[in-house]
């Protein structure tokens, strides 16, 4: 068996354990029970409506004693509703403030996580941009070095002009190139 003692009706955590049990077993019903416990105003409204319905039925039946009892019950239910609203407002004021604080902290944490993710994405994009620029500069430097290198083959050999190389060498730019095209025909 477990090391914990059996629960007692005098145990201050009894209702807490009951709520935990209800929450784990029946979450939808737990929410209804929790709302009824923390906000008893709907229960007062239902009791008032029930009293009015019973008063109507008593009036139709002609039972004036039951009618008077139901009207008194309606007044008690309305008083309960008012007291529940005022008392619940005072009683749960600290809890509501604590819940708002918790919700604000969760929202701040969520916003901070979103901001951190955005900053990480910006850093990744910046790193990719830097890497691309470095590669682009490396390719540009390699192209410049390849363009500036003289051809190493036959540098020591004497240059002898040939007829083909003299004819193919344009001297006047585009106009000479067009004229040379006309000569080939």
Curated annotation (Swiss-Prot):
Keyword Coiled coil: yes
Transmembrane segments: 16-33, 75-92
Subcellular locations according to the entry: Mitochondrion membrane
UniProt domain HIG1: residue ranges: 12-103
GO biological process annotation, one example: mitochondrial respirasome assembly
Lipoprotein among keywords: no
InterPro entries: Hypoxia_induced_domain, RCF1
Coiled-coil residues: 92-117
Primary localization class, coarse: mitochondrion
Composition bias, Basic and acidic residues: 128-154
Membrane topology designation: Multi-pass membrane protein
Residue ranges, annotated region (Disordered): 128-185
Gene Ontology annotations for the cellular component aspect, listed alphabetically: mitochondrial membrane
Binding partners and assembly: Associates with the respiratory chain complex III/complex IV supercomplex.
Family of the protein in this entry: Belongs to the RCF1 family.
Protein name: Respiratory supercomplex factor 1, mitochondrial
Species of provenance: Uncinocarpus reesii (strain UAMH 1704)
Gene: RCF1
């Amino acid at each position: 068996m477990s090391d914990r003692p059996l629960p007692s009706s005098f145990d201050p955590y009894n209702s807490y354990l009951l709520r935990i049990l209800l929450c784990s077993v029946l979450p939808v019903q737990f929410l209804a029970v929790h709302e009824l416990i923390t906000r008893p105003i709907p229960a007062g409204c239902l009791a008032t409506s029930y009293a009015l319905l019973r008063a109507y039925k008593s009036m139709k039946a002609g039972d004036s004693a039951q009618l008077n009892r139901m009207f008194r019950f309606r007044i008690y239910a309305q008083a309960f509703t008012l007291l529940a609203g005022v008392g619940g407002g005072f009683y749960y004021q600290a809890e509501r403030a604590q819940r708002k604080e918790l919700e604000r902290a969760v929202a701040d944490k969520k916003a901070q996580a979103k901001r951190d993710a955005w900053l990480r994405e910006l850093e990744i994009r910046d790193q990719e941009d830097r890497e691309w620029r470095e590669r682009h500069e490396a390719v540009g430097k390699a192209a410049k070095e390849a363009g500036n290198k003289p051809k190493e083959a036959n540098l020591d050999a004497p240059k002898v002009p040939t007829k083909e190389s003299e004819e193919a060498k344009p001297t006047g730019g585009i106009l000479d190139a067009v004229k040379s095209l006309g000569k080939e025909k």
